[in-house]
């Protein structure tokens, strides 16, 4: 974890939020799919790679109970400072989401990942990620994955990425998950470059 944590700490330390390549001032694309999820108010929502995302503010305003995970303690420090005493207070987790989770993490009703999974490259890392997802997500819960599409960039933030199709997402999740909705989306990053994403919302059936 140390090398990747150092990399991401350096990325966050070097730039203000609006300069980060994945920064979104408008999180409406994610909300478009989350609007298909009933009962987010009061739900427990896990965000791997929460970073400094403005989605956190929106979900808190909607009454969600958040578990915010990131490999970068610098990102979590900045996010804590921004949120201040806002209620409900999130739970905080400084952890590599590809590694086994520590005990005591609450089960969640939704798992929301924008641009995290695609940084995991080895089969061990990807398998570990989905093992954690399945361990935390309740039956009936929802998973939103938003990753670089097959036609997307091959690198981001100085790292190689694994690009995804909806079919591969479904295969990795396994037979207990059903697709609710998926769509392609081109995000224009702060530098003005187009970044093709695939957004997919799944529901856990068992």
Regions found by a protein language model. Give the residues of each.
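A conserved beta-strand element that flanks and buttresses the S-adenosyl-L-methionine
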Residues: 112
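Short catalytic micro-motifs in class I SAM-dependent methyltransferases
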Residues: 115-119
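Class I (Rossmann-like) S-adenosyl-L-methionine-dependent methyltransferase catalytic domain
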Residues: 1-106, 123-206
